[in-house]
Every structure is written in C-alpha cells, then in structure tokens.
C-alpha cells in the first residue's frame, strides 16, 4: 500500500482529515506535492473555477495592499513562533518564522483560498483560509521552504521548488521561510518601512507566542520586541466567577511599561464562534499602559480596530474575513461584559497598588454632539465607561496619606480647581465636611483625576462629595485662625475671578502691613498705591494705610486685587496731595486713623 498516495487522496477528499503518514525526505515531500497538484488538476472543472475566482477576489479582499504581512504575523503566532523576520531583497521578500514546521496536511490550506487547517483549532487565530491569498496583491507566484518541503504555488497549482540560498539568520531546519518573488517596482524599501510605521512593540502584547518581529529593507532594519516579567497572580471576578488572572509587565524597546492581565473563562452554552471551534475555555486579556498618552486597540490576537481608551483588549472576537474590523455577531456582543470585568479589576489594581495617579486609564464621555457608530470598539468603550462609573467608582480605595490606610472615594473631599493653590488639606477637609482631603499623591499632574471624578459625580456614582466651592471658602475670611496672608491674597483674587465681588466688599479681606484685617470700603479705608512714591508730604496725617507686602508681589493674584481696589477708589498715591487731603477730610474715618 502506498501510504503517501493514500494520505494525499484522503486530504484531497477531506482537508480536515487526520493523516499520520511520515514525509522524511525532500524526495518524498516533492512526490507528495506532485500528487496533490495532480489531484487538484483532476478535480471537477466547476471546483477549479471556483478556486481560481476566489484567488482573484483575494487580491482586493483588503484595502491594505500589504495585508498579507499581517497574516504572516498571525500564522507565525499560531505556529508557536517566537521570532518572525521579514527581509526585502532586490527581487523578492523573505518571511521566516521559527515556529512549528510544515506538515503534509498544511500544504493545501497554505495555497488554496477559503481552505483553513485551523477551523477546528480553538486556540489558533486563523479561521477563514483566505489570509495568504491576499498575496495576489503583490504576486501570483510564491514559495514555502521548510524541511523536507520546498513548494511553489502558482494560482491553484503547486509544484516542487528548488531550495533557495537563504541568509544565515533564517536558514536551517528550525525555520519556515516564505519566498515571494517581486517584479521590479512592486514593493520598495520606503513603502515597506512606511507600512511598518503603523506597528509598534505593543502590537505584540496580546499574541500567544511571538516575541520578536524584525523587518529589514536595504540598509534599514527595525525590530519590534517586548521584555516580559511575571509579576503575580490575582483572583478576579470575571463573568460572575472568581478566576485566576496572570499579571505580567511588558516593557517596550523605548522603555514604555504595560501591565498585562490574562485569564481563561468558561464559555456559555449559547456562545458560538463564526466558522471556528469553541474550546473548553476562552482567553481574555487586557494590557494597560502605565504611562499616559498611549492609544488603545481591540485585538483578535493582533490589533484589529482602534479603541478610544488607554487599553488594549483581547478575546476570541469574530473578525470579518479581511481582518479590518469585527463582525456584527452575537458572540462579540456577549464577550464585551467579560472584557469589561477584567478591565475594571485591572484598572482598580493599578490605581490601588501600582500608580495612584493612573487616571489616564479611565475613559471620559465623548464630546457633546459626537455620535459613535455601533461598532464593536464603540460598544466596548461604552461598556468600560459604564463600568467605571458603577463598580470602579464605588469599589476604588486610595491611601489617605503616604503610608496611611486606604479609604473609599466617598470619604474624600476635593476643592474646585480654582482653589487648588489656595486651600490646604485641613481647609478642604473642614469645608468639605469629610474625613479626608484627596491627597496630592493620588492627583495626576494633568488634572485628569478631576475630570474623572466630575464625570462620576454627575453620573451619581458612589455618593461622591461635591467639590468645595469658592463661595464656601469665603467663610475662611472670617476665621481669625486663618492667618496665612499669601493664601488670603489668593482666595480674595480667586473670589474676584469667580464673580464674588459683592461678597468681598462686606468682608475684612485685606491685610495691612501691621496685620490688621480691613474691608475694601473707600468710605472707611484708604490704602497706599504701591505704584506711587514711597512717601508723601502728608504722611504725618496717617490717613493712608500700607497693605501687606504680599499685595505688591509680581504675581497674578496680587495684580487682580490691586486692579480691583483701584476700580473701587480704595488706592491712593502718597504723592497725590489732593487725594490724601480728601481722605483726611472724610470725618469719622480720619479721626479713627489719627487716634
């Protein structure tokens, strides 16, 4: 019995069939390739025509002419490769990975459109069997080399190929090498490198195996890679069940750090993947950037769609065949809350244990008037925003001080932004009637914490306290123990900018050089205008009072107050004799000043 011929016949009848035949030598592999090609040529004409037309259609399957390179990345990860190398040469491009080698059963799915050897493999990303057919955007002929197989594909036909001379870095039995001949001008080094600019190290974050991707074109070479560190394990409530989640740190070549959470969940009875097997568990993963300014994305292994949240999320979402978006499938909708569970737990973990100022991880509402499309990434963003307002807002606990105990957000008072440089923690705590003031150590420098809390407050989340307002802080002007003149100056200036002039005119909000607090009433007090002479001919009368030196400082606070006092005719130049006499002639006020 010719075992090899029998195995080929079996695969031609059922490409998913299991064959255990060994192909030990290049000669046997070449014979198998010829038998496969003969079987395809002997097939019914209608089937050959369908395959040929499918290949023609694959040329325009994606709007990205180099989509096939993304497919190579996906296939390499499915093969368990740790490295993928892409090398553009003068007349071809080589794509090589160090994953599992080529088997007889792999040959037909590599070359035939809509034929996949991964449909029954729940863990593999591939499913449609069309990805490598997008090669037709570059060429109609290509080769694969992996001992003992050396195969050339041309349309729907295949034949043995001569082993090529390969660079040392990708030669040897450990490597599977795809060779893609290119006509002159088909792909330049500039075009390849420009395409690759859309990728970065973080593109590899949620792959299962691939850790390094190198692209070389001419004298230019770029490497994407991540260095990984196992951090810990956490028990996280996902989909209503406590699950073990692995926590790792991944660092990019430019030093950016990501905190990655991965777990496995049990599928529901009604979960069904499109054209793909469903395993006994479903992987879920999120990657959170520990630095702000990083864009997010939705992955199905590789990034597929942008996500307007500082997170990369992954599970077994159903993509469309071109992998340029996601299908409108029931499963995709069912997986959104599962991802949100892991995301909420991860963000809380970062804020509580890693970086108390990582507010950039929390989404904010879209600008008014924007209408998000009903795409998967939009539904994910909406779910994460809702989850943040609900569970995260109520469950998050932050330290009350450095080294101090944690407290829920409802126990913290915060001041409105205008008061940030005016009040200290004791003022905020007292005015906000709260156990604690939100400490500086949990406030990010960009102020996103304030926007997040404002959104949560507006959503009625977690009974957050209202901000201490400027009008509340004006009560401190009547507090004899509030003696810090610099802060009193700031509070007065802030109150003016907030439109509370009518309140200030009745308050002792000004401090003289000798420490008295007086009201800004021209009928009661005249204050020396520091812009005039330091002395005047009528100083002996004592009717013009010197303000505290804090009002003469060159800052916005002092300038706001002195400008206001001028408008109210409360400032008098010492060398303006007429004005001083007028002040002296104000009867009861002058007598009070002289006494």
PLM regions with names:
Residues 159-250, 333:
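ATP-binding catalytic core of ATPases
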Residues 81, 139-141, 209-213, 220, ...:
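A broad structural signal for short, well-ordered beta-strand segments within beta-sheet-rich domains
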Residues 1-190:
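GHKL (Bergerat-fold) ATPase N-terminal catalytic module, capturing the glycine-rich phosphate-binding loop
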Residues 65, 103, 128, 137, ...:
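Active-site-proximal structural scaffolding
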Residues 1-20, 182, 223, 228-233, ...:
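Amphipathic alpha-helical coiled-coil/helical-bundle segments that mediate oligomerization/assembly
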Residues 144-147, 151-153, 213-215, 352-357:
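Acidic/polar loop patches that form or flank catalytic/metal-binding clefts of enzymes
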Residues 82, 91, 174-176, 209-211, ...:
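Residues at beta-strand starts and edge strands
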């Amino acid at each position: 019995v010719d075992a090899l011929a029998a195995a080929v016949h079996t695969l031609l009848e059922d490409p998913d069939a299991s064959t255990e035949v060994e192909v030990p030598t290049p000669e046997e592999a070449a014979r198998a390739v010829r038998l496969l090609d003969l079987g395809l040529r002997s097939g019914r004409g209608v089937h050959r025509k369908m395959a040929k037309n499918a290949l023609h259609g694959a040329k325009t399957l994606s709007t990205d002419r180099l989509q096939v390179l993304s497919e190579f990345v996906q296939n390499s990860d499915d093969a368990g490769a740790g490295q993928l190398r892409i090398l553009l040469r003068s007349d071809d491009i080589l794509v090589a990975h160090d994953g599992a080698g080529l088997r007889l059963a792999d040959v037909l799915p590599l070359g035939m459109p809509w034929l996949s050897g991964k449909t029954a493999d729940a863990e593999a990303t591939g499913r449609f069997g069309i990805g490598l057919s997008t090669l037709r955007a570059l060429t109609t002929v290509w080769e694969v080399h992996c001992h003992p197989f050396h195969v050339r594909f041309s349309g729907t036909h295949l034949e043995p190929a001569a082993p090529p001379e390969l660079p040392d870095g990708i030669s040897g039995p450990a490597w599977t090498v795809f060779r893609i001949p290119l006509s002159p001008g088909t792909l330049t080094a500039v075009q390849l490198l420009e395409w690759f600019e859309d990728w970065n190290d973080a593109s590899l974050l949620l792959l299962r195996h691939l850790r390094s991707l190198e692209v070389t074109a001419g004298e230019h070479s770029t490497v994407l890679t991540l260095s990984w560190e196992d951090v810990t394990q956490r028990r996280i409530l996902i989909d209503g069940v406590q699950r073990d989640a692995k926590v790792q740190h991944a660092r990019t070549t430019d030093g950016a750090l990501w905190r990655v959470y991965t777990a496995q969940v049990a599928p529901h009875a009604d979960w069904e993947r499109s054209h793909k097997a469903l395993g006994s568990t479903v992987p879920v993963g999120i990657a959170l950037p520990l630095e702000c300014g990083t864009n997010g994305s939705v992955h199905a292994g590789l990034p597929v769609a942008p996500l307007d949240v500082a997170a990369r999320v992954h599970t077994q979402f159903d993509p469309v065949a071109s992998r340029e978006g996601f299908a409108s499938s029931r499963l995709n909708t069912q997986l959104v809350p599962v991802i949100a569970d892991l995301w909420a737990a991860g963000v809380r973990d970062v804020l509580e244990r890693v970086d108390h100022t990582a507010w950039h991880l929390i989404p904010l509402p879209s600008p008014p008037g924007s209408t998000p499309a009903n795409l998967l990434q939009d539904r994910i963003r909406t779910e994460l925003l809702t989850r943040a307002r609900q569970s995260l807002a109520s469950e998050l606990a932050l330290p009350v001080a450095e080294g101090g105990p944690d407290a829920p957000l409802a126990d913290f008072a915060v001041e409105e932004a205008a008061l940030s440089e005016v009040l200290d923690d004791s003022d905020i705590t007292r005015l906000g009637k709260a156990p604690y003031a939100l400490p500086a150590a949990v406030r990010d420098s960009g102020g996103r914490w304030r926007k997040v809390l404002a959104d949560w407050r507006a959503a009625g989340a977690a009974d957050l306290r209202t901000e201490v307002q400027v009008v509340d802080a004006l009560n401190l002007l009547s507090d004899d123990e509030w003696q810090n003149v610099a802060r009193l100056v700031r509070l007065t200036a802030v109150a003016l900018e907030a439109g509370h002039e009518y309140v200030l005119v009745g308050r002792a909000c000004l401090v003289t050089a000798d420490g008295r607090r007086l009201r800004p009433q021209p009928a009661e007090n005249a204050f020396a205008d520091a812009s005039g002479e330091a002395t005047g001919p009528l100083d002996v009368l004592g009717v013009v009072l010197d303000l505290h030196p804090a009002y003469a400082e060159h800052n916005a606070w002092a300038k706001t107050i002195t400008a206001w006092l001028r408008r109210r005719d409360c400032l008098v130049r010492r060398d303006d004799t007429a004005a001083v006499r007028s002040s002296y002639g104000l009867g009861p006020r002058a007598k009070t000043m002289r006494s």
